[in-house]
């Protein structure tokens, strides 16, 4: 005879029952059925009833002498956990972790004649009868090696279910009196009946085990244990402990790692997330970002307030380690209202606060310093320009140009550029561009350096230069009228000007404008003016047909008090030859605009 596989609702472990335990359970079920089927003592009747009826069930009275049940041999834990496969059948058996609650009530309340005890006893007898009758075709000793899966146990009568529902509230709590326990049926009977009831056949989807339907509705659930050995040991020691101690043990087993691991450590170890809350502690990423700090504080207070209500074990260590910084946010962050951490929390947030404040202060100081330096530079340049002793211009707004002409380091003091000083960049000459109409001192020095380094080069290539053959004949030598500063060959000038990448026709036009000797060479003045015209073309100015005399004069001397005012022919007071005469109204307006623009550029 074989029992089918039944998966326990509480624990998912499947354990095969040994052959000796199967035989003992079947024997106990048969004895229990015979006893309750024939209460008058006719236990030896050959024919057994097929169904039990609650209406005609006789009242079982407590008898002084009860039949002694055969005690099974004690087995060790390793023997109970051993798996044995029956021949011809590969399925495993599922053993319940705890005995049925109805069987405990029947064993412990055997002496009482209450209808609840009678109903519980009849339920156990019915379960034993259905399993033994459906699976056994011959005597107790003879068992079929092959299980017939098509046979189904008869359904429980409706009267028995109604009686269980009526007596649900009248079932007394289990008593742990040693006298009553000694006069009741031995624990092997309850063990066998619970085993047989849990091993019922469940082939169809609509037909489930009787234990899940009846016991869950009629009796309150108890914390089940996760192994067969633990259940047997706990039932053996139940009578030796008081109810308070049993409650503590049940709480401990419920809090143990075998049943979820709801143990919270505090002190040296951080707060561990319980296994039951891991799914709920990982919400969506959107809710994490959009969650307000008030909700985080509520979640934190709820977690610490539910520790004692849920009966979780809190392990407080003696060494309370204070961590200054942490990466954990949300409901696991430390707050001022949290009483579970006794140490001071001021130093926890002091590091981050001081770092942020110091960074902000440093940025503010840098901004203030940069602004102060700019104001100081503006004041210095303004004082240098206004306080110059060489300012003899007729109009006060022309002091910029006057200072630029006499101060070689003041090329940055103009209305179109910043006040910060910078050197001339040959690759970017337009950054130092000023539309003055003449050559400044800095430009002249730059051009003169190129003149000095390239003059007197390759002059022997000239046709009019005396050759080496004529040097021996001193009578035919004629003195050369060379300028004091020297000469530069036109081929050298062409090579230098080609570096500007200007069009060739434009360079030819510039050369023709500055060539005064007409002998294939350029003197110092022509070379400097030609270089200045090349730079003006690079700055974007158009080349004029004639050069102003101021440009030629600025090569050898300084230009003082130059006013760029175009003569107006409509004004009869203006004389082009006298720049100090009364200007026109249009020029006055233009000068006022220049003054206002200069005042805006000066940063005070």
UniProtKB/Swiss-Prot annotation:
Official protein name in the record: Protein TAX4
Extent of Polar residues compositional bias: 176-185
GO cellular component labels: phagophore assembly site
Natural source organism: Saccharomyces cerevisiae (strain ATCC 204508 / S288c)
InterPro entries xrefs: EF-hand-dom_pair, EH_dom
Gene3D superfamilies according to UniProt: EF-hand
Domain EH: 469-559
Renumbered residue ranges of the record's region Disordered: 38-77, 132-249, 267-299, 338-380, 394-428
Subunit structure: Interacts with INP51.
Functional note: With IRS4, acts as a positive regulator of INP51 activity and phosphatidylinositol 4,5-bisphosphate turnover. Negatively regulates signaling through the cell integrity pathway, including the MAP kinase SLT2.
């Amino acid at each position: 005879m074989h029992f089918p596989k039944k998966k326990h609702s509480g624990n998912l472990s499947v354990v095969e029952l040994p052959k000796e335990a199967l035989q003992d359970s079947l024997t106990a079920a048969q004895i229990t059925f015979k006893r309750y089927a024939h209460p008058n003592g006719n236990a030896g009747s050959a024919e057994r009833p097929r169904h039990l009826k609650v209406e005609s069930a006789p009242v079982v009275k407590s008898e002084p002498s009860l039949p002694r049940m055969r005690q099974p041999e004690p087995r060790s834990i390793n023997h109970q956990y051993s798996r044995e496969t029956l021949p011809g059948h590969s399925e495993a058996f599922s053993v319940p972790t705890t005995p049925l609650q109805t069987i405990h009530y029947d064993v412990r309340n055997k002496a009482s004649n209450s209808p609840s005890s009678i109903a519980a006893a009849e339920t156990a007898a019915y379960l034993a009868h259905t399993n033994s009758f459906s699976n056994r075709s011959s005597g107790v000793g003879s068992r079929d090696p092959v299980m017939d899966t098509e046979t189904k146990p008869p359904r429980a009568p409706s009267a028995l279910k109604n009686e269980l529902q009526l007596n649900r509230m009248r079932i007394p709590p289990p008593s742990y009196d040693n006298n009553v326990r000694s006069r009741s049926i031995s624990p092997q009977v309850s063990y066998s009946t619970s085993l047989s009831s849990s091993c019922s056949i469940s082939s169809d989807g609509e037909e489930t085990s009787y234990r899940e339907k009846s016991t869950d509705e009629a009796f309150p659930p108890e914390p089940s244990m996760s192994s067969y050995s633990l259940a047997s040991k706990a039932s053996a020691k139940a009578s030796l402990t008081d109810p308070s101690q049993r409650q503590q043990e049940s709480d401990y087993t419920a809090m143990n790692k075998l049943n979820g691991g709801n143990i919270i450590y505090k002190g040296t170890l951080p707060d561990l997330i319980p296994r039951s809350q891991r799914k709920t502690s990982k919400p969506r990423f959107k809710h994490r970002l959009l969650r307000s700090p008030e909700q985080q504080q509520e979640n934190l207070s709820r977690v610490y307030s539910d520790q004692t209500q849920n009966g979780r074990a809190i392990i407080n260590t003696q060494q309370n380690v204070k961590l200054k910084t942490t990466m954990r946010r949300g409901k696991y962050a430390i707050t001022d209202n949290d009483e579970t951490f006794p140490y001071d929390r001021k130093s926890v947030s002091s590091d981050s606060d001081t770092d942020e404040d110091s960074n902000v202060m440093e940025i503010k100081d840098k901004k203030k310093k940069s602004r102060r330096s700019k104001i100081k530079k503006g004041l210095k340049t303004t004082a240098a320009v206004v306080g110059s002793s060489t300012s003899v211009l007729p109009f006060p707004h022309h002091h910029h140009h006057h200072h630029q002409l006499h101060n070689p380091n003041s090329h940055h003091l103009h209305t179109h550029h910043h006040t910060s000083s910078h050197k001339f960049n040959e690759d970017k000459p337009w950054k130092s561009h000023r539309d003055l109409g003449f050559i400044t001192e800095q430009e002249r020095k730059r051009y003169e350096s190129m003149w000095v380094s390239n003059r007197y080069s390759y002059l022997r290539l000239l046709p009019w230069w005396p050759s080496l053959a004529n040097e021996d004949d001193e009578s035919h030598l004629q003195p050369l009228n060379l300028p004091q500063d020297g000469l530069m060959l036109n081929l050298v000038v062409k090579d230098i000007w080609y570096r500007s990448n200007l069009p060739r026709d434009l360079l030819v036009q510039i050369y023709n404008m500055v060539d005064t000797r007409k002998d294939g060479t350029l003197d110092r003045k022509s070379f400097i003016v030609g270089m200045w015209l090349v730079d003006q073309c690079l700055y974007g100015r158009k080349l004029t047909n004639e050069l102003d005399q101021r440009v030629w004069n600025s090569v050898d001397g300084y230009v003082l008090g130059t006013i760029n005012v175009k003569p107006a022919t409509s004004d009869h007071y203006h004389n082009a030859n006298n720049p100090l005469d009364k200007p026109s109204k249009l020029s006055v307006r233009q000068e006022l605009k220049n003054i206002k623009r200069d005042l805006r550029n000066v940063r005070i």
